[in-house]
Design a protein with these regions (language model features):
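Acidic, mature catalytic/reactive cores of soluble proteins
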Residues: 1-180
């Protein structure tokens, strides 16, 4: 926090922005921004339950609906579901075939995607508590690994290519888990 305040004093409001290892302000494209947000939500997903409330406080929409903030948020899950569907439809119409994303976000994406695809067969039945915990832990570890990488080592500045078709396939699988 002290470093951020020092950068703000030195260069202004841009000093609060993320930087890569070299100290340059880190800039990314729109797909990476929304993908990082989506992956962060999915890393807190509990199958057949909702989105884990890390702060254990209700979000504004939960509180307005008199939902207790303990545990998981179905409201956040419903908003995520709506967004996944919107993104799927939008990308399906896009002529873009590939996007460049940060290597770190690419690794995060692969970890979340692999967790879902490796466990797709559980959607044939009710998910056991053991399997639910296994999936939840794998998603959570993916999120923790991403956060630790960025917090401890910053972004490397290296890019990876993501096929839009792969992203669309991921959205389909994620929607299957959310809808289960």
């Amino acid at each position: 926090e002290k470093n951020i305040h020092a950068r703000v004093e030195s260069i202004g409001a841009d000093g609060a922005l993320l930087t890569i290892k070299s100290g340059e302000i880190y800039r990314v494209n729109f797909i990476e921004k929304i993908l990082a947000t989506t992956l962060a939500k999915l890393s807190n997903f509990i199958p057949e339950a909702g989105i884990w409330m890390n702060t254990q406080r209700p979000e504004w929409n939960d509180a307005n609906n008199a939902l207790v903030g303990n545990g998981v948020s179905m409201v956040t899950l419903y908003y995520l579901r709506r967004f996944l569907s919107f993104l799927d439809q939008t990308l399906a119409k896009s002529i873009t075939q590939q996007v460049e994303i940060s290597e770190e976000v690419s690794n995060f994406f692969k970890a979340i995607s692999n967790t879902f695809t490796q466990n797709i067969s559980v959607l044939d039945n009710v998910i056991s508590n053991t399997k639910r915990k296994e999936i939840t832990d794998a998603l959570g570890i993916a999120g923790s690994n991403f956060r630790n990488q960025v917090y401890l080592h910053s972004f490397s500045g290296k890019k990876a290519t993501l096929d839009v078709k792969e992203l669309i396939s991921f959205l389909h699988v994620a929607l299957q888990f959310v809808d289960h």
